[in-house]
């Protein structure tokens, strides 16, 4: 039970970060925010990961760096979309990476995904169409978040193919460090880099950099050794629900019947597609969810 509670707590933290990040990037440049966020995450993981990085070798380090740059691209798209649409929409559309993962595996590796996954695609796509028809968000924002979900799905599939033989903590550290480097270059090129000011920005940076990323990874690793895969999947399915809860209570999201119906359809699509995604990833889908919380 403590492990399940810990996992649910982590998903609640992920849910509230969407609200915090939306508020922060309204007053602090997007790429600068993400660069600092990944700098904090990398620094937090540096101590426990430092002795393990050598074990990755050159191939592992290069692979981690490449996947880290993909991760940075996904976060940039997701956060740009979050700026333009609602917190609740962002949470549910981001969750569509579960639906898209089997499709990307099909395209790249001809993996079979089954009728349930196709059903999930259809239902989730219908939900996305319903969300795009409301006035609370924006089609452009929703599409940016959907593009982020596609990048996350690609990153997941490549991760499963090339990373299982490497230490998870060391590989994650390299990914986060590479994401930081890539985002830093963009922030400097745009002239956006500056010292963050105010609790709104620093609060979001600390929660996303320390609790949602680095400590979230450690809690997740501890908890998943002490509970079943079924309970883990149950806990992680709460993330979009938490996002909607905090979007409604803290960000004032009012999506109406059509919008909330779209969220429900996307959630149903995720539930339908998740078994196929788990098969594609040899049961490792839950261990990768951490990467795509705000």
Give the positions of each predicted feature.
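Transmembrane alpha-helices of multi-pass small-molecule transport proteins
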Residues: 26-73, 100-104, 151-158, 172-191, ...
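Helix-helix packing/entry segments at the starts of transmembrane helices
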Residues: 35-36, 90-98, 158-181, 213-249
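C-terminal transmembrane-helix exit sites in multi-pass transporters
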Residues: 44-53, 97-119, 241-261
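Glycine-/small-residue-enriched transmembrane alpha-helix faces in small-molecule transporters
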Residues: 1-32, 69, 73, 77, ...
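Juxtamembrane helix-entry segments on the extracytoplasmic side of multipass membrane proteins
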Residues: 1-4, 25-31, 35, 56-62, ...
